[in-house]
């Protein structure tokens, strides 16, 4: 068995922003070092891109993605499963307004209807895989003011590279545009979440996985994360683990937490840090 390569795109981004970022204010009043515009590419056939220089809480990543795919925008479902990552932004009744899941699954139309963007993606990949319009947007300008937190990971596109071998399935890649990227806390979640989504969509559409491309806008490290970043950058990364999906449900919306297993996740200890709200 060929050993998996050790990749460090994420750590390179962190180091670049930490060493060369511009001091910049922000909405939370915390202060940041920031760089505008960066891209990372992860070959999903090499392994599942779960950051190894600190332990990342995989359960929260999986549950949050399933919550998005439910079209849900109330934290109760997450809380019932022990996931509290959205609690800081929730209103008293648990609602967050029309955030990610609502836009993904039921984008409102002027005539009172709704568009299920995720179902459109699946349908188009199966019928027109060469389409350049296989896109999901969470950035609904008309509804931003009603959201507890405007979308940070705002827009993503799928792409199928046809196989050069007759009879083999094509390779599915996904590119995400993240307008606001909290490098220490948020970005490891976002990378793993969209890599997982790419695996799920590929399974549903009988495709192989290709690349996950992460494109960031305002890439920043909060000033109250500087010590944690120094700790993390002193560590050497390990090879990424692998992802196993244990069953193929009837649709993209029918996966359960128990369907996923990450194998061989070697990692350094977790590093705690405050969330900027």
Curated annotation (Swiss-Prot):
Catalytic activities: dUMP + (6R)-5,10-methylene-5,6,7,8-tetrahydrofolate = 7,8-dihydrofolate + dTMP
Cytoplasm found in the keyword field: yes
Active site: 152 (nucleophile)
Gene3D superfamilies for the chain: Thymidylate synthase/dCMP hydroxymethylase domain
Functional pathway: Pyrimidine metabolism; dTTP biosynthesis
GO cellular component: cytosol
EC number: 2.1.1.45
Pfam families the record matches: Thymidylat_synt (PF00303)
GO biological process, any: methylation
Annotated compartments: Cytoplasm
Family: Belongs to the thymidylate synthase family. Bacterial-type ThyA subfamily.
HAMAP family reported for this sequence: Thymidy_synth_bact
Name of the protein described by the UniProt record: Thymidylate synthase
Source organism: Acidovorax sp. (strain JS42)
